[in-house]
């Protein structure tokens, strides 16, 4: 049975981290800092669609892990200033939301409502399970912050910004044109690395 993967190997350098992502298929690796969510990996799909367009077309994969035949693991190493989150996710975690902004918002809003890492994990799962049409795995590691309270405080402003700039303006009755305009505004930061 074919599968996809996203793996992050992280080295803590003090004020920064070196992160090497390994992936195959459409599982993704990200980092999230005060400037927002940034997709580091590139989906193995047959077209050159961006993250917004691929949510609508679910591009056909060109590389998956399987026991028979050829596949490859892609790799990319980047240095990231702390504090930051390193995130890996299968498409079941992000692929059933309307926009990449929604995925960032569920990560941050679930954090804002949590008093422990376990509670954050549960709240994030509670937001993903009702919308996903797939199994999912989301891994989050936080660097440069002491505890969940520090993490909430550090990302509070970003969560509010995403809510006011991208979530509240569309509500539940968003049309494609409006979503595309918001995506065009969000996209440069999302692909900044």
Per-region residue spans from a language model:
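Short, catalytically relevant binding-site loops at active-site mouths
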Residues: 28-29, 46-47, 94-95
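Short, solvent-exposed aromatic-acidic interface loops
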Residues: 25, 44-48, 158-164
């Amino acid at each position: 049975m074919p599968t996809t993967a996203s793996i992050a190997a992280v080295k803590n350098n003090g004020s920064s981290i070196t992160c090497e992502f390994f992936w195959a298929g459409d599982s993704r690796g990200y980092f999230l800092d005060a400037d927002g969510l940034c997709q580091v990996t590139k989906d193995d799909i047959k077209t050159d669609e961006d993250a917004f367009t691929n949510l609508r077309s679910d591009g056909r994969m060109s590389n998956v892990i399987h026991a028979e035949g050829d596949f490859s693991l892609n790799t990319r190493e980047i240095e990231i200033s702390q504090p930051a989150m390193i995130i890996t996710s299968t498409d079941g975690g992000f692929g059933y939301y309307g926009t990449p902004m929604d995925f960032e918002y569920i990560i941050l809003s679930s954090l804002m409502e949590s008093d422990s890492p376990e509670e954050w994990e549960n709240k994030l799962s509670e937001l993903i399970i009702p919308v996903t049409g797939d199994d999912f795995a989301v891994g989050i590691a936080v660097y440069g912050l002491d505890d969940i309270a520090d993490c909430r405080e550090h990302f509070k402003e970003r969560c509010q910004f995403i809510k006011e700039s991208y979530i509240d303006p569309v509500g539940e009755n968003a049309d494609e044109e409006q979503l595309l305009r918001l995506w065009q505004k969000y996209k440069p930061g999302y692909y900044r690395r």
